[in-house]
């Protein structure tokens, strides 16, 4: 596997031919390092292709086949998540969990509020809190800045995994790293594990 530069894009080449996505689009990106990483994933494959060992290829396929032609719908879905964001729903008890949520989530939330220039409403438990239209409009303006299709596909994946547009924006804007994003998204679960231990089936 190698990389071919053509028409301002870097194509993944297999045996001299341009690789294609499942939807038959050319597997090509605007970044040479990304293209080289894609080629390395393909080069590492044995006789049988194992998609599970090709996370970057899966992301780029998703970006080119599922996001590139549906950018507005993908952006709109991220904004919808902001309307019921996981970080806005806080525990009322026990006190250690309440404190942990405040310690971990509140700085991230405050950072994103400062970034977008708008405030989120918080709720306790599962009572729905409708976010102000101004807040969602501010989120939409910043989601619109996420480059497509690759970064947008990555952001959509993060949102799906975390249930949080706030965490997605924080990661996309370099406010937190991937490990902190994951830890924040699984704060409640990690707290329960700390109390009750690891669920063997979940593990």
Please provide the spans of the model-predicted regions.
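An N-terminal structural lobe/cap that precedes and organizes the functional/catalytic core
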Residues: 1-69
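Short coil/turn segments at secondary-structure boundaries
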Residues: 51-54, 124, 197
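Internal, conserved structured core segments that host functional sites
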Residues: 72-138
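Solvent-exposed alpha-helices and their adjacent loops that cap or buttress functional pockets
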Residues: 4, 20-21, 80, 144-147, ...
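Generic secondary-structure signature for well-ordered alpha-helical cores
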Residues: 43-47, 110-117, 171-176, 186, ...
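Short, charged/polar micro-motifs that form catalytic or ligand-binding hotspots
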Residues: 25-28, 94-98, 152-157, 171
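An internal, amphipathic alpha-helical element
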Residues: 130-201
């Amino acid at each position: 596997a190698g990389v071919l530069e053509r028409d301002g894009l870097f194509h993944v080449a297999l045996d001299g031919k341009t690789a294609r996505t499942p939807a038959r689009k050319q597997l090509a990106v605007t970044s040479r390092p990304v293209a080289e990483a894609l080629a390395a994933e393909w080069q590492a494959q044995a006789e049988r292709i194992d998609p599970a060992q090709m996370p970057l290829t899966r992301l780029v396929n998703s970006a080119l086949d599922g996001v590139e032609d549906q950018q507005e719908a993908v952006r709109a879905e991220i904004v919808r998540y902001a309307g019921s964001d996981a970080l806005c729903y806080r525990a009322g008890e026990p006190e250690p969990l309440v404190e942990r949520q405040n310690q971990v989530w509140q700085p991230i939330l405050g950072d994103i509020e400062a970034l977008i220039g708008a405030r989120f409403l918080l709720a306790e438990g599962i009572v729905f809190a409708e976010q102000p239209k101004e807040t969602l409009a501010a989120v939409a303006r910043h989601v619109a800045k996420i480059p497509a299709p690759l970064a947008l596909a990555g952001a959509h994946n993060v949102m799906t995994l975390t249930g949080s547009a706030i965490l997605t924006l924080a990661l996309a804007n370099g406010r937190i790293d991937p490990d902190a994003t994951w830890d924040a998204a699984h704060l409640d679960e990690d707290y329960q594990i700390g109390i009750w231990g690891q669920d063997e089936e979940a593990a």
